[in-house]
Amino acid sequence: SINAFVEEMKDKPRMEAYKVLRNWIWYTTALHEMGHTMGLRHNFRGSADQRNFSPEYWDVYNAYWDKVEALRDEYQSKIDAGDANAYQAYVEAVDTIPSTHNRYGSTSIMDYMGDWVKWQYPVGSWDRAAILLAYGNKVEVKNDESGEYTLEQYQTGDFSQEDNYDADEVAASGRKVKYYMFCSDEKVFDDAFCTRFDVGATATEITRNFIRDA
């Protein structure tokens, strides 16, 4: 939120705050448009593809929910007793917790993020995977027990022919293809998670943030 940014930058030099804003607003916009020139479409499901978010997201996300849980423990007994004032105080206290994890809350620069601060690492995992497939003819597969994904080349074939990649063959080899969520303009409003300018990876988070920003 803008309040979180103001709090974060209040003791910083003016030029440092300017550089951060410049990067968030102009740099991310330039990357988005560059994605279009390279053939990428909008991906409005990037903000719902939580399993493919960057590691930075999870560090900040878990810290955020630790603070929410601490507030819940503080107010829960009064709320259970029917104290409406306690519930309102709890809601207001939660709203003061900086939700900086939303900066990392999408797998794609081609998403339309609702939070003005966007994210600090704008080229997401879906963007990289799409470019590697389109220009390098590569997909990510899981081929060991570590949980890490590596790049494996498509089987050699004529690029002008029908896709000859066979997921069954990969499965038979003991490897697993890494999948990403994708949804573009024609599906907006058909899918609750294919939405422009939403913030959050779950229905609860998205709804709460829409209400907060109303």
Can you say where each PLM-predicted feature lies in the sequence?
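Active-site recognition of the HExxH zinc-binding catalytic motif
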Residues: 28-43
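Soluble non-cytosolic domains of exported or imported proteins
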Residues: 20-25, 29
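Conserved catalytic/binding loops enriched for acidic/polar residues
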Residues: 1-17, 21, 46-214
